[in-house]
């Protein structure tokens, strides 16, 4: 009985699996790259100002994320995954600029990358929540929201994972790999953007 109470049937909804699931880890993946990975990569250039620079990147990323959350809801479309598509599209240049910043060890480019990744983070977070609200019924909303956040939190492991892989691959290469993975996620969402809509919206 207890386990039955913990079940979230809406988590098996095809729209959740093919639209929300591919984008969710990128929420805090983008944020983590902006305020954890980039400061570390710029360490040799920022020197004694490293802590201040890290704080600046965090402020820029989270500030841009907060800003886009206020306006991002306007891009929502009940008949498609338009807002999520926009959010994942923002992720591509963000990671691309991060790769260039890492290659050139340029704090200025890192600042730009943090801003773009911050925008992507905020847009991803709000667009995913809106999609979850449509998929879940009233009884499943709290549970599905918890599942959604649990998946987004996987992004917090990105900095640690990149630090481990950096023994074999450079950060520019890993950021480019991130662009490829984000593009694949975007491709999946594009394929299912107008499919498996919640029954109340399908007509």
Mark where each language-model region is.
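Short amphipathic helix-loop junctions that connect adjacent transmembrane helices
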Residues: 36-52
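Transmembrane alpha-helical cores of Major Facilitator Superfamily
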Residues: 25, 56-59, 63, 115, ...
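C-terminal transmembrane helical hairpin of 12-TM major facilitator-type secondary transporters
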Residues: 81-126
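Juxtamembrane intracellular "pre-TM" segments in multi-pass secondary transporters
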Residues: 1-20
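Pair of pore-lining "gating" transmembrane helices in MFS-fold secondary transporters
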Residues: 14-34, 111-116
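A late C-terminal transmembrane helix in Major Facilitator Superfamily
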Residues: 121, 127-174, 178-179
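Multi-pass alpha-helical transporter architecture, strongest
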Residues: 179-203
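Transmembrane alpha-helices of Major Facilitator/SLC transporters
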Residues: 54-77, 90-94
């Amino acid at each position: 009985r207890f386990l039955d109470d913990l079940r979230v049937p809406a988590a098996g909804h095809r729209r959740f699996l093919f639209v929300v699931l591919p984008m969710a880890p990128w929420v805090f993946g983008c944020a983590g790259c902006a305020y954890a990975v980039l400061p570390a990569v710029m360490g040799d250039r920022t020197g004694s100002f490293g802590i201040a620079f890290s704080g600046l990147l965090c402020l820029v990323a989270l500030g841009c994320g907060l800003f886009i959350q206020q306006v991002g809801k306007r891009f929502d479309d009940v008949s498609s995954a338009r807002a999520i598509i926009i959010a994942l599209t923002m992720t591509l240049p963000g990671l691309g600029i991060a790769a260039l910043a890492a290659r050139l060890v340029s704090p200025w480019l890192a600042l730009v990358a943090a801003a773009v990744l911050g925008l992507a983070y905020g847009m991803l977070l709000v667009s995913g929540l809106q999609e979850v609200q449509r998929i879940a019924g009233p009884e499943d909303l709290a549970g599905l929201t918890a599942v959604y956040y649990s998946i987004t939190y996987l992004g917090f492991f990105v900095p640690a994972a990149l630090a481990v892989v950096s023994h074999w691959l450079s950060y520019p290469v890993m950021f480019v790999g991130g662009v490829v993975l984000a593009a694949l996620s975007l491709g999946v969402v594009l394929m299912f953007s107008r499919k498996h809509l919640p029954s109340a919206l399908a007509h």
